[in-house]
Amino acid sequence: MPAGLSYSLTGNPNFNTDIGGFFCGSYNTRGSGSAPKNPQFQELYVRWMQYGLFCPVFRSHGADAPREIWQFGQKGEPVYDAIEKQIRLRYRLLPYLYSTAWQVTSNNDSYMRPLFSDFAGDQRVWDMTDEFMFGRSILACPIVDPQYTEEKIIRTNAMTGWDRKELTIDNGQLTINWTDAKTAVKYLPKGAKWYDFWTNQQYNGGQDVTLTTSFDRVPMFVRAGSILPLGPEMQYVGEKTWDNLELRLYPGADGQFTLYEDEGDNYNYEQGQYATITFKWNDRSRQLTIGQRNGSYKGMLQKRQFTLVMPDGQTKQVDYDGSETSVKF
């Protein structure tokens, strides 16, 4: 994480890692390529996938062992399901990520943001390296310590040393209950209110919160005032159109978000073939304004719907034809 944040600070925004580590031979404890069956590697891989969820490029790659999801088990089993959950969420976040990519290329923004970039007045975050902003709305708080297997991580000044302990296996078998609930303490930066992405519970900033965590969920929060677009579940990019995006609204502050769209598979945007829609939330009036669509490109949706979702469960459907419209809650 410190490496990714440092790269962003140097003007290199498209950082990524080999999820699971390029070399994993020391986890092949039962023969060549057996790492995906090793509980230590399974936990490491799932947690690394959860970190990769918030990297500009989400990529599994490496040597010593295969990394396909089915190498870790089958659907219905905890490790497989945890990996699948991260992949599905990444696809749902594509409208947010693609729009952030436009801000990166057009406005010199960044995907991974050290917390002091947005909360410079909060001294607690000045040297924090295990939490960061993913875009302007999402506070990423990956789990960086093993919770289910014995593995000791030693940190010194954000540099990681590694001291792997062998697991004690009775009668040659190791049983781990991946469904056990654990806890993690995360810090919420001062100067904003925050919503737990999974539960919608609201918190004030400037405090540590103790979370009940699970193997398949990465701790993540959304800043009050955010407008978070989520797309449909997909098997691959372009499988489904964005004709009914879910817009999650997080009251507690004014906010805005610009949705960026283009053809998605060429460089025609460099010739101005793209469209943007700006959403603005007025917290005092509890009103969302969906602005007039600007620009166009081949294959652009002329009419669409947006499903607006509030943390308390309120939902409204909006038909949109490119003209400005407003919705009150």
Enumerate the predicted regions with their spans:
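Catalytic-domain carbohydrate-binding cleft regions of carbohydrate-active enzymes
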Residues: M1-D216
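Accessory, solvent-exposed terminal regions and/or long lumenal/extracellular loops of proteins
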Residues: F215-E324, F329
